[in-house]
Amino acid sequence: MYRVWNFITGYSLLLIGGAIIALIWANIDINSYHHFTEVVIWADAPIGHLHDDGHGHVVRDLTLHYLVNDLLMALFFAIAAKEVWEAVILKNGSLRGKKAATPLVATLGGMVGPISIYLGIAYFLGSTTFDAVANGWAIPTATDIAFSYLVGRLVFGAGHPAVRFLLLLAIADDAAGLLILAIFYPSGELAPAWLLLSFGAALGVYVLANWLPRRLDRGDQLRRRSSWMRQKLSFWPYALAGCASWYGFMQSGLHPALGLLPIVLTIPHADRAFGIFSAAEVHLHDLLNTMEHALKYPVEIILGLFGLMNAGVAFSAMGEATWLVLAGLLIGKPVGIFLFGWLAAKPLGLGLPQGMRMIDLVVIGCVAAIGFTVSLFVASVAFEPGPVQDAAKMGALFSFGAAAVSIIVGKLTQVQKQEI
């Protein structure tokens, strides 16, 4: 297991701090909290959320909430996409080859289970409830990589193979979550022609800043053109392409927080992976890892702001959506991961990592039930601001209870902690 502790701890503390401040503020004065989050930074701006100005004109206003959720969070999703991309394409990537088969099948169960529980219970509560909450079906599918890792390390010990299994599952879950956001939760009327700008920017920067210099360097051991590109222009071509791609996503109606994903795939990367958010990656000097290192602290601050912007929910907001999200996470996740993991390991013959027991899948499922970050994000786009959104967010916040459940289940199943 690689050293990811410092990154995850910094990520977690600021995010939790922002969420706690938001919760306290919202329960003291909910009106001032909403006034703060929706303060307009730039009226009639070229970017921002669309609305009618009351005179028949559709304009965009850049609010503080939009700035954090739709613009700055694009950097967080870019880092998540970077880890997924490397895990899939690099020679020893953790999601490459047969070793990832069982975690990937278990990930599918970790999505099917929560969706089935969420929609199933909502259906039995009646058509009124079902119609009100159905669009939130994706909220309990999320697994928060950082918090799941922290709890998994606490339950299993840093050296236990179940922790690596959990990380593979969480990062595959992140990849699936990005797809769900892009496909099922557009941010407005779809205008897919604008995606030509995004993918055109990605193709252009890949050809001009990545492929062409390497092509011209054939036979040149000093790789002068690639070195000049890296030393003189650095990340700037990709930053400009990222701005164009983000704008294309915003105009297309897809969620703009995903707007940097096409650009991530074009950036020169290392030929090997050290692990998820690994500290060993400081020894890699490819542009993709260099950019991730530079973004580390800004993204920690952004996540703190994200917690502040999204976790401000009054406790009186608890409702049916709260319990549906919790049921999806606390029941659907463990059941789905165990059943699909068993299916992969036994009938399909894919097996489990050496040192893992079948019962460990139940504990992994409990740990993976911590949704928080991505669950909050999905709740904010699945529902319009109001009681249902607030209730769903409360369910995402309460998913921290999965940490206590995981510790208890770990004790009951006699997990033997393995430290490095």
Curated annotation (Swiss-Prot):
Gene Ontology MF: a single term: sodium:proton antiporter activity
UniProt GO cellular component terms: plasma membrane
Superkingdom: Bacteria
GO terms for biological process, alphabetical: regulation of pH
Membrane topology: Multi-pass membrane protein
Listed transmembrane segments: 4-24, 70-90, 104-124, 132-152, 165-185, 192-212, 233-250, 299-319, 323-343, 361-381, 395-415
Record-stated family: Belongs to the NhaA Na(+)/H(+) (TC 2.A.33) antiporter family.
Protein name listed in UniProt: Na(+)/H(+) antiporter NhaA
